[in-house]
């Protein structure tokens, strides 16, 4: 059969056995990819520094998804939080990967079996003796089973009733761990950052799915609706399935990019909006202000700022800084973070504290400008020295570090001050190892950026697929040139023109 590549799927249009086979094979491919990718990531993942070299800096894609569902241990003896363990149990990262690969193999064999034994009695319509599928009934079965799975996940896995719970953290991504979550049945359950909403929404949606499934199993669709929506046509199923998938893809692209309880920053990295709004910077200053009320020593107060919090406040961790087509992990870009140098405080010769204006997300270069507490420009690194009035040399800017590796160290040399002012544009200053991975110094995006781009792109593609196949199934007769009200048998190709009133007719 000489079908063009874009028409090959028509071979399963009227072949329920082989339609089932290709879907099982698709599941085998998906599960096989997931398991294989997990094993690859585990082979290259370095769990030694969860603070400065977390999974998202290393470009891990499937490990974060396993972790958010409660997997934290490895058969290699390490824990995702940096500890060591002696008994990881079956459901470790490797255990989950292996389960996917075994499942993939079983699906592969099942797909082959169903391809060979395609002509099963179950697919045969006893009235006509031809292969057919009761699509509304199948819809009810799938809705019921997915409802059971959805309810079970929310009621048992997430709540810890029978399962580990999910990854839960504080708003600043510092204290994350896997724990049971109680359903949030109040209005707070609609807050996308409240983990309890995950449990309650799965329980509610699962209950609805179970009831809807039972309804579709026990109630047949009216004939007019059945015909109007082409419920007997498999392409209707394809069209509506694509709609469900692209809708879900758009939703998860949003929850990933803008952030939610389902996409913790400890697993996927911070969002770009946290940089844009100075989210972590505000929390750091709040902690410093609170600390100064009890202890007047800036060094001691800044030394208590968690290195993890300081690291979030660095532009290199902003997923919007890396180009979409720059391959590689964040570590391949600006390097592996080794340590926090400390917080630089700039002052002019009058002792006034100055703040470096931070680089906005979509700038590659940005002028070095230092402002005072009122936002008035007091110093800069000029483009043209001849016209400068606020240069570091003229204003006499110095820098002193508090906290971190350079705690208590100060510099007055203009070249050194300018170096740290440039680096302060990018947030908190870190020592970065670019030699180990031969990092090129060009920022990369995090898995948060890749996931969003991939799902938004495929959602758009699938949206057009839904329109295409929906139109094909709704207007199939029109596209084929057949009048839906035709009551006469016409021999196609034998007459001059289809629909010509002079054409001979033969009663059906």
From Swiss-Prot:
Binds multiple chlorophylls. PSII binds additional chlorophylls, carotenoids and specific lipids. The keyword Thylakoid applies. The keyword Transmembrane helix applies. This is Photosystem II CP47 reaction center protein. One of the components of the core complex of photosystem II (PSII). It binds chlorophyll and helps catalyze the primary light-induced photochemical processes of PSII. PSII is a light-driven water:plastoquinone oxidoreductase, using light energy to abstract electrons from H(2)O, generating O(2) and a proton gradient subsequently used for ATP formation. PSII is composed of 1 copy each of membrane proteins PsbA, PsbB, PsbC, PsbD, PsbE, PsbF, PsbH, PsbI, PsbJ, PsbK, PsbL, PsbM, PsbT, PsbX, PsbY, PsbZ, Psb30/Ycf12, at least 3 peripheral proteins of the oxygen-evolving complex and a large number of cofactors. It forms dimeric complexes. The chain crosses the membrane at residues 21-36, 101-115, 140-156, 203-218, 237-252, 457-472.
């Amino acid at each position: 059969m000489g079908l063009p590549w874009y028409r090959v799927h028509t071979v399963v249009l009227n072949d329920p056995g082989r339609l089932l086979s290709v879907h099982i094979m698709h599941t085998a491919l998906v599960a096989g990819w997931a398991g294989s990718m997990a094993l690859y990531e585990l082979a290259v993942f370095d769990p030694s520094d969860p603070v400065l070299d977390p999974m998202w800096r290393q470009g891990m894609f499937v490990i974060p998804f396993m972790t958010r569902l409660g997997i934290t241990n490895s058969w290699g003896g390490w824990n995702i939080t940096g500890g060591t363990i002696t008994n990881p149990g079956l459901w470790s990262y490797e255990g989950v990967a292996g389960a996917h690969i075994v499942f993939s193999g079983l699906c592969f064999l099942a797909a082959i079996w169903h391809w060979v034994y395609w002509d099963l009695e179950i697919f045969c319509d006893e009235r006509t003796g031809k292969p057919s599928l009761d699509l509304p009934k199948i819809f009810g079965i799938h809705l019921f089973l997915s409802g059971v799975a959805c309810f079970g996940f929310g009621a048992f896995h997430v709540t810890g009733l029978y399962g580990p719970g999910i990854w839960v953290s504080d708003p600043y991504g510092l204290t994350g761990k896997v724990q049971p979550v109680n359903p949030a049945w109040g209005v707070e359950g609609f807050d996308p950052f409240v983990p309890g909403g995950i449990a309650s929404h799965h329980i509610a949606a699962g209950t609805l799915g179970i009831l809807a499934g039972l309804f579709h199993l026990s109630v047949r669709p009216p004939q007019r609706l059945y015909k109007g929506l082409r419920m007997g046509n498999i392409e209707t199923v394809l069209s509506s399935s694509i709609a469900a998938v692209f809708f879900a893809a758009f939703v998860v692209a949003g929850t990933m990019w803008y952030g939610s309880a389902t996409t913790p920053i400890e697993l996927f990295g911070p969002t770009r909006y946290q940089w844009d709004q100075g989210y972590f910077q505000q929390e750091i200053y709040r902690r410093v202000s609170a600390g100064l009320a009890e202890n007047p020593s800036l060094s001691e107060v800044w030394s208590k700022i968690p290195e993890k919090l300081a690291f979030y406040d660095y532009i290199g961790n902003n997923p919007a800084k890396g180009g979409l087509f720059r391959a590689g992990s964040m570590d391949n870009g600006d390097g592996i973070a080794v340590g926090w140098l400390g917080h630089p405080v700039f002052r002019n010769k009058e002792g006034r504290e100055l703040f470096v204006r931070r680089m906005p997300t979509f700038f590659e270069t940005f002028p070095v400008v230092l402002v005072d507490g009122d936002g008035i420009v007091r110093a800069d690194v000029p483009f043209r020295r001849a016209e400068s009035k606020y240069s570091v040399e003229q204003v006499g800017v110095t820098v002193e570090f508090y906290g971190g590796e350079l705690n208590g160290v100060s510099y007055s040399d203009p070249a050194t001050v300018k170096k740290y002012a440039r680096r302060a544009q990018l947030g908190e200053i870190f020592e970065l190892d670019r030699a180990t991975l031969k990092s090129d110094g060009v920022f990369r995006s995090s898995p948060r950026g890749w996931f969003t781009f991939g799902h938004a792109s495929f959602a758009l593609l699938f949206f057009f697929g839904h329109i295409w196949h929906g139109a094909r199934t709704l207007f199939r007769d029109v596209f084929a040139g057949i009048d839906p009200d035709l009551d006469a048998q016409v021999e196609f190709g034998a007459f001059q023109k289809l629909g010509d009133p002079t054409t001979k007719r033969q009663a059906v």
